């Protein structure tokens, strides 16, 4: 059951980034009702949550995950084992936010790989002690920081089952905690 958005006379306390994402999603849904859409206090609170999320993401924006190949590729047409280590779920969320609309993840790295390279990714979120595996394909490369986007690789997830896609969508919506992400390996 979803928690309703607190009434205007109740102070909102946010204890985690993902809780803020979940609250914003609920507020966006509620803002579509005629009563809330015209409520200036509600809209101001929604703006506060949006600002909190934006500031938080800006603080992690410059931090780069560790990305390394676990084997020397002989042929980039065959999947290459690789590992990406994020400090925590917020950094993973930020990487998904940059490319999940396109069905993948953006990994900030100075490493270059050919377009269409196949990857068997092992993803680790250090703070939460969560590890999972997912298949990916390099769909674009940004060799150096340009147009506000850091150097890195755009990786499209492939072979995702409907359940795995739902796990990622629910995580992005703040509905699932990071410890549910190992279901992606199934």
Predicted regions and their residues:
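Short, charged beta-turn/beta-strand-edge "cap" motif at the junction between a beta-strand
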Residues: 124-129
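Short beta-strands and strand-coil junctions in structured, solvent-facing domains, enriched
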Residues: 104, 144-145
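Short beta-strand segments
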Residues: 93, 130-134, 151
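C-terminal output/interaction extensions
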Residues: 2, 145-186
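N-terminal helix initiation/capping motif
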Residues: 1-100, 174-186
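Short strand-loop-strand
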Residues: 77-122, 152-154
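Short beta-strand-centered aromatic/proline hotspots
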Residues: 133-142
């Amino acid at each position: 059951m979803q928690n309703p958005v607190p009434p205007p006379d109740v102070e909102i306390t946010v204890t985690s980034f993902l809780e803020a994402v979940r609250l914003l999603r609920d507020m966006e849904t509620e803002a579509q009702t005629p009563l809330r859409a015209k409520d200036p206090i509600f809209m101001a609170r929604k703006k506060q949550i949006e600002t909190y999320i934006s500031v938080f993401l800006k603080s992690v924006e410059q931090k780069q995950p560790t990305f390394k190949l676990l084997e020397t590729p002989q042929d980039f047409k065959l999947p290459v084992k690789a590992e990406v280590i994020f400090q925590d779920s917020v950094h993973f969320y930020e990487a998904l936010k940059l490319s999940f609309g396109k069905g993948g993840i953006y990994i900030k790295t100075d490493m270059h790989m050919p377009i269409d390279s196949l990857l068997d990714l092992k993803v680790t979120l250090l703070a939460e002690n969560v590890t999972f595996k997912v298949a990916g394909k390099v769909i674009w490369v940004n060799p150096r920081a340009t147009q506000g986007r850091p150097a890195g690789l755009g990786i499209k997830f492939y072979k995702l089952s409907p359940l795995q896609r739902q796990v990622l969508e629910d995580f992005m919506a703040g509905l699932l905690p990071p410890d549910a992400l190992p279901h992606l390996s199934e």
